[in-house]
Design a protein with these regions (language model features):
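Internal intein/HINT superfamily modules and their associated LAGLIDADG
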Residues: 1-182
């Protein structure tokens, strides 16, 4: 569950200081996908050992999965001032080891936060499923691509921020452990 939560954190997560040395882990998710919200709550709850909470995020389309704990910066040492895409993001050695053992969980978290599976269409009426991952951080895109390499999935870049998985066999491989958002 940690590697999945790491993927969510790298995509749409943040850690902020709270009272008395406690930190708040917050993962912002779309309300259209209650299954992903439930998985995020389960992951944060399992790691923390206490129930995570779901709070509305300003507008009606998002919620924050939140958990308070002094240890969050230890588990996510990428925490720091500023936006993740404006600073260096590097996995620690122990995080790399976990990501190598469970690259599928890391990919699931990254896709659930900053990716999607959609039907690509073209001239002549052809339709085929495709995954995209859009992320402003070069470092996080690199982490995504490395995880794809670990599971044997080919990827391509499009523009500065988008990674696609388009080949039929590679999409089928991701479907084994990710699939459409729910």
């Amino acid at each position: 569950m940690y590697v999945y939560l790491l993927g969510l954190y790298l995509g749409d997560g943040s850690i902020s200081t709270f009272a008395r040395g406690v930190y708040r882990l917050r993962i912002t998710l779309d309300v259209k996908y209650p299954g992903i919200i439930n998985m995020a709550v389960a992951a944060a709850t399992e790691i923390r050992g206490r129930p995570a909470a779901v709070h509305p995020q300003g507008e009606d389309s998002c919620v924050n999965v939140s958990s308070y704990w002094k240890a969050w910066p230890c588990l996510f040492p990428q925490h720091g001032p500023g936006r993740k895409h404006q600073r260096r993001i590097v996995l620690t050695r122990w995080q790399e080891e976990l990501a190598k053992r469970w690259p599928d969980e890391l990919l699931r978290g990254l896709i659930h936060s900053d990716g999607c599976r959609f039907m690509n269409t073209g001239r002549g009426g052809w339709v085929c499923p495709r995954y995209s991952f859009v992320q402003a951080s070069d470092d996080i895109r690199s982490i995504f691509c490395h995880a794809c390499d670990l599971v044997g999935v080919r990827w391509t870049k499009s523009g500065q921020r988008t990674i696609y998985v388009s080949r039929k066999a590679d999409v089928a491989k991701l479907d084994e452990f990710i699939g459409p958002k729910r």
